[in-house]
Regions:
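Extended, hydrophilic extramembrane loops/domains of integral membrane proteins
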Residues: 1-11, 84
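Helix-start (N-cap) segments at beta->loop->alpha junctions
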Residues: 12-16
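Hydrophobic alpha-helical transmembrane segments
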Residues: 17-57
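Residue-level signature of catalytic and energy-coupling elements of molecular machines
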Residues: 24, 38, 75, 122, ...
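Hydrophobic alpha-helical transmembrane segments of multipass membrane transporters and ion channels
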Residues: 25-31, 106, 110-123, 157-165
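Alpha-helical transmembrane segments
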Residues: 32, 36-42, 124-127, 131, ...
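Predominantly long cytosolic amphipathic alpha-helical stalk/bundle segments
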Residues: 49-124, 128-143, 171-205
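Pore-lining and gate-forming transmembrane alpha-helices of multi-pass membrane transport proteins
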Residues: 146-177
Length: 205
């Protein structure tokens, strides 16, 4: 008889809807944060990907900068600066790069925040579930395990959901942050190239 009961336990797999119901309102909040983080990642990936392509195209036409990309705007910021004004040239380049950084890093902090909040909400769900379990024990005793199942399910499911959401979001944040930093580094490299070419022209002149 016990084998049949064990087989029934293994054969029953809760659906996603049932898992969400077991997690309660906290589980729903965790899943909502995960969906928000995923949407942010897709948005930032699409934006940074398009910026990367425009910057790469601009790098092939370095003598014809346009305002459609960060690199072009940085190069245009030093138009009209004389070759002899090296300090002013460097200041304008630094200012232009700093002006581009917020747009490239926008949303990264929010993705990281969502990744940090999710396991904490899972812990909150765990504590809440255990409180419900102890309340059931104090009211009805331990005679019927089904009365405690709801609280225990919430305690376990919210912990799992918090980790399931947090771990991918950490990878997403690392990917988006690395992509943004690589483009900022490319801007710095191009600025160094402008200063080097200016120094060569001064030396040649």
């Amino acid at each position: 008889p016990s084998r049949g009961s064990l087989l029934g336990i293994f054969a029953y797999t809760p659906t996603l809807r049932e898992r969400m119901e077991q997690g309660g309102s906290i589980g729903l909040i965790i899943l909502s944060l995960g969906a928000l983080g995923l949407l942010l990642t897709l948005w930032r990936s699409s934006y940074l990907g398009s910026v990367f392509l425009r910057m790469r195209a601009q790098a092939r036409r370095i003598d014809r900068p346009t305002r459609s990309n960060p690199l072009g705007r940085v190069l245009l910021s030093v138009e009209g600066v004389g070759l002899e004004e090296e300090e002013l040239l460097q200041l304008k380049l630094d200012e232009a790069v700093l002006a581009e950084i917020p747009a490239l890093e926008r949303g990264n902090g929010l993705i990281k925040l969502l990744a940090a909040i999710s396991p904490l909400l899972g812990l909150l769900g765990t504590v809440t579930g255990m409180i419900l379990t102890f309340q059931a024990i104090s009211l009805f005793g331990t005679g019927d395990p089904k009365l405690m199942a709801g609280g225990i399910s919430q305690a376990l499911v919210t912990t799992v959901l918090g980790l399931v959401v947090a771990i991918p979001l950490l990878f997403c944040h690392s990917f988006i942050n690395a992509l943004a930093r690589s483009m900022i580094q490319r801007l710095d490299e191009q600025c160094a190239g402008v200063l080097a070419r200016n120094a060569d022209l001064q030396a040649g002149g």
